[in-house]
Amino acid sequence: MWRGLWTLAAQAARGPRRLCTRRSSGAPAPGSGATIFALSSGQGRCGIAVIRTSGPASGHALRILTAPRDLPLARHASLRLLSDPRSGEPLDRALVLWFPGPQSFTGEDCVEFHVHGGPAVVSGVLQALGSVPGLRPAEAGEFTRRAFANGKLNLTEVEGLADLIHAETEAQRRQALRQLDGELGHLCRGWAETLTKALAHVEAYIDFGEDDNLEEGVLEQADIEVRALQVALGAHLRDARRGQRLRSGVHVVVTGPPNAGKSSLVNLLSRKPVSIVSPEPGTTRDVLETPVDLAGFPVLLSDTAGLREGVGPVEQEGVRRARERLEQADLILAMLDASDLASPSSCNFLATVVASVGAQSPSDSSQRLLLVLNKSDLLSPEGPGPGPDLPPHLLLSCLTGEGLDGLLEALRKELAAVCGDPSTDPPLLTRARHQHHLQGCLDALGHYKQSKDLALAAEALRVARGHLTRLTGGGGTEEILDIIFQDFCVGK
């Protein structure tokens, strides 16, 4: 239905367009003079729908659609009757807000129409706006693209806005909001200023090296600034994987011998019946994955086949896939039957999977492991019976839920260690583009340190500074901008 409504509005302006699409090559570039309009709120029936415009004809559109005709007080809500400028027919009684540029989201004159969210109302207002000369439907992400073009947002802030729109967990929301607030951009600008000062010192020495009036230690000061920046860049690059996990999700793999309760735990954590639970060993024969929100962190939870040998070819393929997922896991939930710790399968699992991951130091591997002893409801008050020596572990009963709170708290701590704390940690690198430019900057600083020729050293500093400038959007190519803005839909 909504695509049909949008098509009607588009046809009234300049021919049909899709509701959510990449910017076409023929679309006017931001700042071309066209005024754009779009439905900015969600699709479907709702109490209030928000329709916005941006561009020089926004004030004109507001005047001819409303009564009285004068513009309302800037940035104050005003109740107005909306009418179709072609027929004079009333469309809705709505709240309108007038945002004269440059004090607006896009930096241009903007209007917001807060109308009743019925399809007929929204359709009527969109068609009315499409009939106003100089107005056309917005392309995907065009409002934000204009904000970027007009200097209201830098590129990292644009990416933060996209991440905020798509955030599904508390941690993702916090990280996206910090990036939207400009923390990563401010950090990069500070680094760029450091490089500018270092470059000024080097070029001063090149131009006035034999001048008695030149301060002593100019090159040494540049070296100190570069070394400090190398340390800072290296620290952020080491943390890059944490930011990518926070944006894309932490891979948590549940593994263990058959019938340890792996599928029951996956169902418990995901709060829905993802996996089939059966007392028959080998029920799970493939990897089942489900995205979940655990303690505010995004997680891709994988249920895997029980690890054992000497089974049929189908289950053996499931075991192979389970071991493959184990190698890819960020966090392993190792499950054992607390009432059967002395069995060969339990002892073998402890000696192989648990021991091998536990032997790794955090500096050698990003993998972490929690050992969970399930079926605690079958234990005597004294706890687990005779068996192998156990590393630190958690007791849980998937049947009764006893021990679940302790497991969730342990998971929260592990996920915070894997992803970082988006509330207090330094700004994280959430995209491969960020990592690429910081690595390029670090490589260029390495060339600076190795250069015997001061002219080549100065050029290396320029290259390093260029990477930081491009990270925040300076000198970015249209292709890169198109990739970033394709994450937005019409109206944003």
UniProtKB/Swiss-Prot annotation:
This is 5-taurinomethyluridine-[tRNA] synthase subunit GTPB3, mitochondrial. Belongs to the TRAFAC class TrmE-Era-EngA-EngB-Septin-like GTPase superfamily. TrmE GTPase family. One of its GO terms (cellular component) is cytoplasm. Disulfide bonds: none annotated. Its main location: mitochondrion. It comes from Homo sapiens. It is found in: Mitochondrion. Residues 1-20 form a transit peptide. It comes from the Eukaryota. Forms a homodimer in the presence of potassium. Mg(2+) binds at residues 263, 284. K(+) binds at residue 259. Residues 249-416 form the TrmE-type G domain. GO terms for biological process: mitochondrial tRNA wobble uridine modification; tRNA methylation; tRNA wobble uridine modification. One of its GO terms (molecular function) is tRNA 5-taurinomethyluridine synthase activity.
